[in-house]
Amino acid sequence: MKSLETMARYKKELTECARNLKLPFLAEHLDEILHEAQEKQQTYSEFLSTCLMRELRDKERRSYLTRLKFAGLPARYDLDLYDFSRTEGIDQRQMRELRELVWIRRTYNLLLVGDSGTGKTFIASGLIHEAVKAGYKAYLLTLEELFVCLKTKEISRPAMKTYKRIMKAQLLAIDDVTLFPLKGEDVLLLFKLVNCVQG
């Protein structure tokens, strides 16, 4: 039977290896995972599978939280709370179809049109959230925010970071399009962006 000192050394080495291999969940929860393996009398392959599966689940969770953080969502975006009793808006069947995200996989553009207060921003935010949950990189911003980013990206580090996120996004929702008057150079900037993103 191995001494406590030897076991402690192994745990320390395993933790360091996990950190060096960029397996933060394993490094942080090694004691708990080892204890669970002993309790369940896991085989080596069961233990290894447990380690890797839990690391993978944690990586997926962290990736989701990062995508959600950068998505630019407002406080309310849960499509389950959408009021279908409105006379203007989409019905439940249309909402289910949109939430399936087939339109993203087929690279269709989606245009939400309606009067102020009809829920366009809410629906766009909810669809961004659905896309993030499905593993897509998605981003919501107003047209004004988009133009500030496009016009200042060469001189502003935060604007350049935003621009890079926009360029990597698989779904980009532009809000308040009708509230921002477009000038000639703005139209050209928007056209170039759409060309780059879709090209």
Swiss-Prot record:
Q: Which residues bind ATP?
A: G114, D115, S116, G117, T118, G119, K120, T121
Matching InterPro entries: IstB_ATP-bd, P-loop_NTPase, Sigma_54_int_dom_ATP-bd_1
- The organism sits in which domain of life? Bacteria
- BP GO terms, sorted: DNA replication
Bilayer-crossing regions = none
Nucleotide-binding in keyword set: yes
Sorted alphabetically, the keyword list is: ATP-binding, Nucleotide-binding, Transposable element
Task: Please give the Gene Ontology molecular function terms for this protein.
Answer: ATP binding
Give the family, as the similarity comment puts it.
Belongs to the IS21/IS1162 putative ATP-binding protein family.
Q: PANTHER family, from UniProt?
A: ATP-BINDING PROTEIN RV3427C IN INSERTION SEQUENCE-RELATED, CHROMOSOMAL REPLICATION INITIATOR PROTEIN DNAA
UniProt-recorded name of the protein: Insertion sequence IS21-like putative ATP-binding protein
Lineage, opening ranks: Bacteria, Pseudomonadati, Bacteroidota, Bacteroidia, Bacteroidales
Q: Which gene encodes it?
A: tnpB
